[in-house]
Amino acid sequence: MSKELSPKYNPAEVEAGRYQKWLDADVFKPSGDQKAKPYSIVIPPPNVTGKLHLGHAWDTTLQDIIIRQKRMQGFDTLWLPGMDHAGIATQAKVEERLRGEGITRYDLGRESFLTKVWEWKDEYATTIKEQWGKMGLSVDYSRERFTLDEGLSKAVRKVFVNLYKKGWIYRGEFIINWDPAARTALSDIEVIHKDVEGAFYHMNYMLEDGSRALEVATTRPETMFGDVAVAVNPEDPRYKDLIGKNVILPIANKLIPIVGDEHADPELGTGVVKITPAHDPNDFLVGQRHNLPQVNVMNDDGTMNELAFEFSGMDRFEARKAVVAKLEEIGALVKIEKRVHSVGHSERTGVVVEPRLSTQWFVKMDQLAKNAIANQDTEDKVEFYPPRFNDTFLQWMENVHDWVISRQLWWGHQIPAWYNADGEMYVGEEAPEGDGWTQDEDVLDTWFSSALWPFSTMGWPEVDSEDFKRYFPTSTLVTGYDIIFFWVSRMIFQSLEFTGRQPFQNVLIHGLIRDEQGRKMSKSLGNGIDPMDVIEKYGADALRWFLSNGSAPGQDVRFSYEKMDASWNFINKIWNISRYILMNNEGLTLDVAHDNVTKVATGEAGNVTDRWILHNLNETIAKVTENFDKFEFGVAGHILYNFIWEEFANWYVELTKEVLYSDNEDDKVITRSVLLYTLDKILRLLHPIMPFVTEEIFGQISEGSIVTAAYPTVNLAFEDLAAHTGVESLKDLIRAVRNARAEVNVAPSKPITILVKTSDSDLEAFFNSNVNYIKRFTNPEHLEIASTIPAPELAMSSVITGAEIYLPLADLLNVEEELARLDKELAKWQKELDMVGKKLSNERFVANAKPEVVQKECDKQADYQAKYDATVARIDEMKKLVK
């Protein structure tokens, strides 16, 4: 057992050194018990781009809650940690650091640059693990993985080669999304579409014979030097006689043909479309149908190349302005039509993505997608929580495009393809024998290796490895809804293809962490929260309680310091009631307490309040376990909070004072036993959410670590509906008296007459047998409980189930004086309402003030209105008394 609890709860003291003690004791490793059912989770590997944010804290807290509970329930648990190399993101960070030193990756060369990236990785991997420790994550570091580890790299090469041999990976020249800042290809889901202010530029392309001009429109006039044709619909009577003729490309003054193609819609614009196969995906398809050349007029950094005439070397957006000016100068510009349109931006660098013809590697998705869709109709399907995300998954798989997997980066898994001077290509898991082979310089999309994470981390492709046989498929994946497409879907189809199994049985989807105004946290808004700052102020347990208790599966959660204050206050309450119980413990051990509680359950000892709290504890265990199993941690938290704060602390602990302050030593031992036993179960129930403080308190009452203590289970012997019903009626009576006192402004310290009328003889007997509790909580001068009590003329009355309660007021207050006081109070709230109403009716204030300031005034208005209405209700009640 540990040292005595400090008088005040100090999370820094409680949490200091605790994590290292757990690591030293190896309590986070699997038990190795082959008779136990395995339960495994692989951590969604954070990118080694920097420190973890609040979203990571939420994600990992939920996983830790699950794995800690399963460990306590006797499962053979594995929570496998690891990190992702995050190709484009990490490389961009390192290049940014190098730019600060005045150098580029090209100055260093590939090998030296990669050395710098590995140094970055080591630096931030250390930081991330320190953050995991502060969060209290019970991961098994002996199995830590990194996506560029040799074992995982071997899995990546095997998957690539196998898919290539099946014809499901291919290399070809197609239009892809190009990031000019990172100088790499992007997949469709790495492109974020944003509505931006732009324009349609209308231009005239003159027929070769000069007889007429065809008007075309584009949002990207700088690409016009890549135009190789204009298209018209072959059924469009305005233009079908022009098919086969030529137009003159302005500025370039070269001839390009007019082709007939259904891509040109007669109903849209002029019905004439310029065709730029190297810079537009639809034009690329038109070009293939008509065997048109592909002319790329842009460099990989977003500048114009030598085919752009005098605009060569210009940035694409500068070139756009210059080209438009030139078109106007030569009379080819018809008009500029301002319009908001959707433009793709790189998810990583934020720059506008350029559709660009490029030779890349692709994964053919049709059969992989079909397999994933079909699996959701089998017993091996993946269960989504909440279930609506199953539809999201299926919709994406039904509409998926081929996946571009090559990236023009240096940091990542280099593509296992080699070329020689004879134009031959070799694809294999190892380099080809002989000289003269050069490996493809591109690397694979980060998500290609991440898609293998659940099984590559378990030892695959070594299918006989102990971890793979024991812990795969994994039990549960926890992740945000923002990466269902990026990651979850890809893990499912790759796992089905290469292991024949689902990668995980369950997927718990959570939302995003937002600020108090509901905005997504971002650097640009400056509203990001560092979880380490929160932990420093409140402790990890308070942050974990907030994160677990704040939302339902699939929903976003709003962070606020007010909620953090409430979390800290709850833990402080637990600390204080624990100290109270321990201070009154008198050396009682948990084993003796358990034996005594058994006597309470069998009726050999104890009183009705003891049986009531044990019954409610039983219900709490059942409901919390049920909601944990459904990943409804918010519901479970609410149940725990209500039981601990309301039923245990506010009621039972207070009720025990009637016994603990008495002279009956036998009763005291029983009461202490129930207190200690219930505290023990509370700590175990809370431990998955609040590991640090529960370990600290548990050390006062038991040997060993709570990490491996048994999770509470329902004890049928504790079921006692009669005790539950009786004490709930007792509570109702006490609450009714307290509320009546408050309504007529009679202080709790002032003794009063209380009359309880009930025609239920059992209830009458119960109240009379527990009259000491009623007296302790209601402070009566006179208390009468009977079936025949005449209703007093001047009295406050309340009705509870089975009884009526009267508080005679004749000697307690002057009704006229109380009405006068209430009238003054009503005037006060009316004045406040008038002031806030005037402010909110000011259109300039509402339009110009910050939204949070306006909201604050609205909240004040609602608060004042509620107080006004309550005062009116109290006046009405008082007036009824004098009728």
UniProtKB/Swiss-Prot annotation:
GO MF term (any one): ATP binding
Presence of keyword Transcription: no
Extent of motif 'KMSKS' region: 520-524
Enzyme class (EC, first level): ligase
Keywords: Aminoacyl-tRNA synthetase, ATP-binding, Coiled coil, Cytoplasm, Ligase, Nucleotide-binding, Protein biosynthesis
Full protein name: Valine--tRNA ligase
Source organism of this protein record: Streptococcus pneumoniae serotype 4 (strain ATCC BAA-334 / TIGR4)
Subcellular location: Cytoplasm
Key word Protein biosynthesis present: yes
Cellular-component GO terms for this entry: cytosol
Chief place of localization: cytoplasm
Gene3D superfamilies found in the cross-reference section: HUPs, Isoleucyl-tRNA Synthetase, Domain 1, Valyl-tRNA synthetase, C-terminal domain, Valyl/Leucyl/Isoleucyl-tRNA synthetase, editing domain
Domain of life per record: Bacteria
Reaction catalysis annotation: tRNA(Val) + L-valine + ATP = L-valyl-tRNA(Val) + AMP + diphosphate
Protein encoded by which gene: valS
Quaternary context: Monomer.
Pfam families: Anticodon_1 (PF08264), tRNA-synt_1 (PF00133), Val_tRNA-synt_C (PF10458)
Role this protein plays: Catalyzes the attachment of valine to tRNA(Val). As ValRS can inadvertently accommodate and process structurally similar amino acids such as threonine, to avoid such errors, it has a 'posttransfer' editing activity that hydrolyzes mischarged Thr-tRNA(Val) in a tRNA-dependent manner.
